[in-house]
Every structure is written in C-alpha cells, then in structure tokens.
C-alpha cells in the first residue's frame, strides 16, 4: 500500500463524525490535500466525478468537502479548475462555502528541489537541436504515470505540460520513490485500485506526478514552441500524434515504414516522431547496424523488476550488444546515475516499435522550412554525433 493512500484510509475514520456534527462547513483553512474520498471504489469513477468528496487534513482533523467544478463548455463539460491544481500531500489555503471548496492556492514548500538537468533547451527556439535538448531535460527524474501530463479530467494538457521547465512536481515524486515503484500494480494479475497510481476510475488523480508517452511529447513541444506559461497545450492521443503534427504543416507524415536493419536502406532521422498503437517516441537517429536510439516515457522494468520507468534514453535493437543500446547505456549511466541505479537501459523490440494498425499511426519528419530549422545539420548525423553535440 502506498503511503499516500495509507494516510487517507487512517484519517478517513474521523470524517463521518465531523460531517455529522456539522463542523467546518464554511471558512478558510490551511490544509493538506489527502485525495478523493473512497478512491479506487467502483463508484468513484469518471461518470460520477462531478459529485466527488475531497479529503483534507487540517490540524490533525480530516475534513471532507465537495468542490466547485468550474464552468461548462458548449458540450456541457466542466473545466475543473480547482481539481487541476490538487496534488496529494501538498499544502493549500482553501476557501469553503457551505461545505464546498470554492477557491484554493498552493502554499509553496520552503525546501523545494533545486534540480538542474544535465541538458535543457530554450523555450521558443524552434530548431531541431533545441527540440532534442528540450526532450532531454526530464530524462532521469520523471517517472511514468498513466495519464501523466494530461489534465485531471483526461481531456487535454495538464498545468505541468503547459508550463515552461521541468516540473518540480515530477522531481519531488521521483525523489519520493525507489526501484520498487510501480505505475500500476506490483502484481498485475491482482489489481488493487484503492492503492494504485493507475487511473482505474477514468480520471487522472496523479496527473501531476509524472508523464506518460503523449504527455511527454506534449511537454516537449510546448517547451520548444512556447515562451510563456498557460497557453493551449499539445498533449493528445499517442497513436495519432505524429499525424497531427503533419496536419499543422510542420513536416511530412508517412505510413511507409519498416524497421531499419543496417542493410535495407531505411533509417529514422534525429527528431523524427513515431506513433504506433498506444505509444509515441522521438528518434535520436539510426546507427550503422540499424539499431535506433530513442527518447520516450515508458513503464520499463526496474532492477527489482517492477513496471515503473519513465522519461529515458532507450534503444530499439535485437540485443544488448547493438550500437544503440551501448550508446544509451553510456549516456544514462554517466549523466543520470541515480536513475541508472534503479533502471537498466530499456531494449525495445523492433517488431513492436515499427508495427502498427489503422490509418492514424505513422512516422513524422520535420520540415526545415515550415517546422523546425536545422542549422546544425542534425537530420543527417549519426546518433553518436547527435548525442555528443547535445551533451557538449
């Protein structure tokens, strides 16, 4: 049982008595958010999210409140502005009116992480080199969360993926975990929704804690193209991600794809974005033996064989002796040693990473005229040269 959920279960025993006595129905409080009441229960799901109760701890008391759902759009969907600020175990100043939270603001920690990534980009610099440097910034400190980077209601970009820079929330969550972290269940044959980070209920309770594959790509694009926080985001479904970039006029999309093998003449260029069914990844280029170095967020197994993982440099190849794996291993071990102590480099199966069905998956290649410029000539370089330039 994760510690967040344990605290909720223990403290929730006092909620019924507090509600029955009519205590704390209106007022202002400094309170720690504990989570949605009855998290993981069958009825605590997206269909009922407008009626959730939310648990807060204030001065050792656990209080349960309704919450304002915000305003509705033309289709009748709320925007949930308060829910999209809530993060478990964080301190807030909340305003309560007749048992409903109507306003809140986070009270910043005095000892927030001062993590500085080995490589990072410059917001708004629309070059291929900057895209790849930006994509490296969350590597090694951002765990895989299914729905991470999507908003609470699972409709678009979260606050974190519409904000410049690596989110301190990702770093904090990473630092609170170890190699036994699992994005879903320690034993997938025995699902445990009440104690899982996986969004069984169809909404994203842990949207803020890490990134899934499309959340990661959305953050990378936002931090490449935007220069201020809070603009429209780029997060969207992984299978059609590459195709949507082509629709923006930023480059070429194709389904004429096969796995490189070093002899068939097919290569993935640095910066190419590949969508397969349920996953999306960024190419760092194709090695001489046909293996490919990539960047992505994936729940790869830890050294204790738990499905955790996250944003990392990986390799697509046939074995751990392939050129791409050796490169990925070199850079992950040297520049991200804490991550490397938890997670070996992930070797991806070429058949899985180049096979797809349907009309939406495919490969996207940037146009240097209408998408990203490439003054460094990265599209024509080998992965070894690309990585050396990025980490220079």
Spans of model-derived segments:
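Short nucleic-acid-contacting surface segments enriched for D/E, G, S/T with interspersed K/R
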Residues: 73-93
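Low-complexity, Gly/Ser/Thr/Pro-rich intrinsically disordered linker/tail segments
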Residues: 309-392
């Amino acid at each position: 049982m994760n510690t967040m959920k344990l605290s909720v279960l223990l403290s929730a025993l006092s909620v019924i008595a507090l509600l029955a006595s009519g205590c704390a129905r209106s007022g202002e409080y400094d309170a720690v958010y504990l989570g949605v009441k009855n998290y993981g229960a069958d009825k605590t799901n997206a269909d009922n999210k407008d009626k959730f109760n939310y648990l807060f701890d204030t001065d050792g008391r656990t209080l349960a409140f309704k919450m304002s759902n915000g305003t509705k759009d033309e289709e009748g969907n709320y925007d949930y502005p308060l829910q999209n600020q809530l993060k478990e175990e964080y301190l807030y100043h909340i305003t309560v009116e007749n048992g409903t939270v109507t306003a809140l603001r986070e009270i910043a920690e005095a000892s927030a992480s001062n993590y500085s990534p080995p490589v990072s980009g410059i917001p708004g610099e629309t070059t291929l080199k900057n895209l790849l440097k930006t994509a490296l910034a969350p590597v090694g400190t951002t765990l895989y969360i299914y729905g991470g980077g999507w908003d609470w209601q699972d409709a678009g970009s979260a606050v974190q993926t519409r904000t410049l820079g690596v989110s301190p929330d990702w770093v904090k969550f990473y630092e609170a975990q170890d190699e036994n972290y699992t994005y879903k269940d320690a034993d997938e044959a025995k699902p445990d929704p009440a104690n899982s980070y996986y969004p069984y209920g169809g909404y994203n309770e842990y949207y803020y804690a890490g990134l899934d594959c499309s959340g990661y790509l959305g953050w990378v694009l936002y931090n490449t193209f935007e220069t201020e926080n809070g603009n429209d985001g780029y997060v969207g479904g992984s299978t059609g991600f590459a195709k949507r970039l082509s629709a923006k006029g930023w480059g070429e999309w194709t389904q004429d794809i096969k796995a490189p093998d070093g002899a068939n003449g097919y290569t993935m260029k640095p910066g190419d974005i590949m969508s397969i069914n349920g996953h999306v990844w960024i190419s760092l280029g194709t090695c001489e033996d046909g293996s490919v170095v990539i960047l992505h967020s994936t729940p790869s197994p830890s050294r204790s064989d738990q499905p955790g993982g996250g944003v990392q440099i990986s390799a697509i190849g046939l074995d751990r002796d392939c050129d791409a794996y050796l490169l990925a291993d070199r850079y992950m071990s040297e520049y991200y040693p804490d991550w490397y102590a938890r997670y070996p480099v992930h070797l991806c199966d070429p058949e899985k990473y180049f096979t797809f069905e349907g009309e939406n998956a495919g490969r996207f290649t940037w146009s240097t005229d209408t998408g990203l410029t490439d003054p460094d000539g990265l599209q024509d370089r080998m992965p070894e040269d690309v990585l050396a330039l990025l980490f220079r």
